[in-house]
Amino acid sequence: MRKETVRNQRCAGTKADFLLALFIGRSPETETACPASSGMKRSGIEVCTAGEWVATKEIKRLQRIKMIELWNVNKTYETGNKALRNINITVEDGEFVFIIGRSGSGKSTLLKLLLKEVEPTSGKIIVNDMNLGKMPRRYIPKYRRRLGMIFQDFRLLKDRNVYENVAFAQRVIGASARSIRESVPTMLTMVGLSSKYKFYPQQLSGGEQQRVAIARALINRPEILLADEPTGNLDGHNSMEIMKLLDEINKRGTTVIVVTHSHEIVDRMKRRVITMDRGTIVSDEKKGGYTHED
């Protein structure tokens, strides 16, 4: 496909499509494998142009690249609690995965392992070709920037407005003032909060607060978005609106993993469902529903 054709296809979408393509997953300037005979080379790595990036994401999806791999992972806490037992999971680049199960089944421990908040007792965890067990401690903060995280309780800074909450995530990684001025308004437009950038968290609804949290999680263009009960404090309508946003984000290439207890959301979305119980995986359905009994 010629560059002009790819670029024209990319520009044919809506403004929201463009914003999502720009900010979700890897940016157009990310160093990644480009289609054969295209792209420039930087230090031996081919670099895609903006138009080629979209086509490259499709190529990667077709190649079914593994984003996350857990091999025989076990986690026993110092208390003796065996949180995870012989966990084997592969999540491909661009997948949307639900993880369900009753409280204490190991779901949160699984997310903590991916964030490197805790270490496995045994086994191997690979994220985007990186062996987390061999990762130097000094590299962990940089690694975590490649992950986005949203929580049930939003975890917003109550004394800062919407704009400042999202900008904070860029300031902590040393982003320039110019970068913040350009990227934060764009991200707020993407999540539908451009008109409320001066509002404080207590002035927003629960659904709006979660949108701020999503914008903050995505502002640094993560490859993976982890969501721990993202709709737990929301009503049915706002829950589905948040899931529609996560679904759209996923369709633009970001790998999304959602821990939830919501039967309605899981049944309606029809995505991959991993069910956990007592630290083990009891089922893994590619397009499942909520079959676990609480």
Predicted regions and their residues:
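Conserved ABC transporter NBD signature motif
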Residues: 123-131, 143
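Short coil-to-helix segment of the ABC ATPase nucleotide-binding domain corresponding to the Q-loop/switch region
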Residues: 160-167
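Conserved ABC ATPase signature
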Residues: 200-204, 208-210
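Catalytic Walker B motif of ABC-type/P-loop ATPase nucleotide-binding domains
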Residues: 225-228
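Helix-to-loop junction immediately C-terminal to a conserved catalytic motif
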Residues: 115
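A short, proline-enriched helix->beta-strand linker immediately N-terminal to the Walker B motif
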Residues: 219-223
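Hydrophobic anchor residue at the start of the ABC signature
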Residues: 214
